[in-house]
């Protein structure tokens, strides 16, 4: 498993423990006490490192090459998944996957950004950066879900929508804007979960819902830290400073009222334990459906509208702006 820079002390200690255990198996010497001491030290070290993650550490975890993807969670959370392809206008975009599935026996529509697990798949899926046809495919599935009264679950995991010439020619901004408009008025429940990076309009194109949740080490921002640093300071190398200033973590966004709940992750990140992470997401989905149960279509849309009207509100007292 690939290690991140801040994890090196933990990885080195784990390797020492493993080597000592292997040596003990092949010798007559007993190192059980030494192993116990090292394991206690490892537990304390993990608590110290993973319990005090900096913003940039979380950015690295969110981008981890082995972080679970939409299809991983679909496999663990749903049954009878049937993937649907194409936007019926131009083509199919592998950077967004979606289809019909069952959640605890209930028909649902599941949609999400999809990154690759290796170079070949990343190229096929454009590194999880959708073209307009991806967003139009997603909208087609959402409108189908509305027609057949199926709840929608969206998994968000993208650096952003693809900014290439072909995407712009085919109406990238219109496709995203159309999704924002249409999702705001859907008459079925919509649950959105940020599972990795939630980057810019590319994330928002699947991000208008009744409840917005984030995994503990995911990020959600208007631009990547590197992009913000390049614009503000003409130096992408200041990405760490930008990340700190941008308030992009789940804890920051929960405090700001942008998201509803934070889904806990395994120590070190979701990639450490996919089964446990899927259980944590499952608990949150069940809880959210319970909260949405019994709400009429009109009330659903009204509450969704009120939710988004509250985001970003700023109030000033006369004293704070110098008015007597």
From Swiss-Prot:
Any one GO molecular function term: carboxyl- or carbamoyltransferase activity
Predominant place of localization: cytoplasm
Superkingdom, taxonomy of origin: Bacteria
Keywords for the protein's UniProt record, in alphabetical order: ATP-binding, Cytoplasm, Fatty acid biosynthesis, Fatty acid metabolism, Lipid biosynthesis, Lipid metabolism, Nucleotide-binding, Transferase
Start and end residues of each CoA carboxyltransferase C-terminal domain: 37-291
Gene3D superfamilies cross-referenced by the UniProt entry: 2-enoyl-CoA Hydratase, Chain A, domain 1 (3.90.226.10)
Family indicated by similarity: Belongs to the AccA family.
Record text on subunit structure and interactions: Acetyl-CoA carboxylase is a heterohexamer composed of biotin carboxyl carrier protein (AccB), biotin carboxylase (AccC) and two subunits each of ACCase subunit alpha (AccA) and ACCase subunit beta (AccD).
Protein name as it appears in the record: Acetyl-coenzyme A carboxylase carboxyl transferase subunit alpha
């Amino acid at each position: 498993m690939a290690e991140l820079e801040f994890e090196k002390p933990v990885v080195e200690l784990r390797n020492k423990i493993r080597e000592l255990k292997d040596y003990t198996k092949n010798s007559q010497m007993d190192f059980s006490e030494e192993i116990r001491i090292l394991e206690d030290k490892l537990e304390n070290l993990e608590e110290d490192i993973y319990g005090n993650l900096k913003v940039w550490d979380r950015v690295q975890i969110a981008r981890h090459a082995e972080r679970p993807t939409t299809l991983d969670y679909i496999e663990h959370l749903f049954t009878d998944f049937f993937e649907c392809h194409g936007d019926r206008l131009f083509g199919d975009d592998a950077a967004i996957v979606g289809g019909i599935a069952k959640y605890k026996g209930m028909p649902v529509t599941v949609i999400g950004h999809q990154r690759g697990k290796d170079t070949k798949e990343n190229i096929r899926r454009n590194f999880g950066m959708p073209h307009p046809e991806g967003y139009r495919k997603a909208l087609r599935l959402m409108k189908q879900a509305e027609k057949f009264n199926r709840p929608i679950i969206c998994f968000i995991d993208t650096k952003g929508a693809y900014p290439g010439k072909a995407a712009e020619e085919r109406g990238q901004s219109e496709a995203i804007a159309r999704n924002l408009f249409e999702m705001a008025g859907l008459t079925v429940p919509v649950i959105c979960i940020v599972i990795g990076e939630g980057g810019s309009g590319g994330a928002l194109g699947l991000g208008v819902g009744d409840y917005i949740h984030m995994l503990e080490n995911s990020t959600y921002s208007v631009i990547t830290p590197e992009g913000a640093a390049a614009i503000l300071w003409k130096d992408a190398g200041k990405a760490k400073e930008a990340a700190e200033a941008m308030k992009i973590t789940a804890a920051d966004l929960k405090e700001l009222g942008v998201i509803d709940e934070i889904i806990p992750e395994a120590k070190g990140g979701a990639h450490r334990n996919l089964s446990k992470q899927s259980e944590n997401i499952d608990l949150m989905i069940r809880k959210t459906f319970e909260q949405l149960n019994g709400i009429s279509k009109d009330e659903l849309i009204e509450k969704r509208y009120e939710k988004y009207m509250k985001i970003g509100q700023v109030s000033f007292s006369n004293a704070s702006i110098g008015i007597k």
